[in-house]
């Protein structure tokens, strides 16, 4: 018996995308922008209309500066400007919209949305459900296993394990090592100086994982990689930095708050709550009707 897929949504990606793409003249009666919440609501409706999904989790970030990763490496994501107040309040509205649509929401002050998604993916996959991670964040592709998908909904790009190898040059289970070696500018993870995406991919294709690279470091100079001899020295010099980076790039799969209540079966739409919220946000009738139908 084939069990239905579970859809695990990385909320921040789609809230930020709406913030930048939906005109900021969407406001409520107090003149507060509602564009990000409006666009996020439209995204949720579109996703539910396309999939008729009944097992959905929406993961939010509450840990931009309080994540355990910040304790390990204080510069983690330090390159990001704080969200403006006009956007911050919309995150709560976005969560309220998702809850009114009957979707289970998750957030944790010490763990990122990635870790909550990773935990739920592991939990539901172990119970026979295929997993669909809904995000454009390449980090989350590391969670995909045979039968699963990473879905960049806005670009309609849905990738399985083979397609992830084609797109990123490494297998899903190698992505954390790949980012530790090559760095991830988006999250302010420096990687090893002089090791770019091509070198990181070539090393992992040959050795399989980062531990094997360092355990067999003397072999690196003999590889048909440009600058192999100097690459070997860079790896030796910056090994500790790479191992620290991997502690940042690996997505956790055992977050207690998510495992305490992992049920994600969709509830019925809270019509009264949705109407109150839409009245507050002054959303139009067309979006309201879509929400009531999905």
What are these regions (language model features)?
Residues 2-3, 53-57, 147, 160-294:
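Non-catalytic nucleic-acid-binding/docking modules located in mid-to-C-terminal regions
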Residues 2-134, 138-149, 153-158, 241-244, ...:
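Noncatalytic, basic helical substrate-engagement surface that gates or grips nucleic-acid strands
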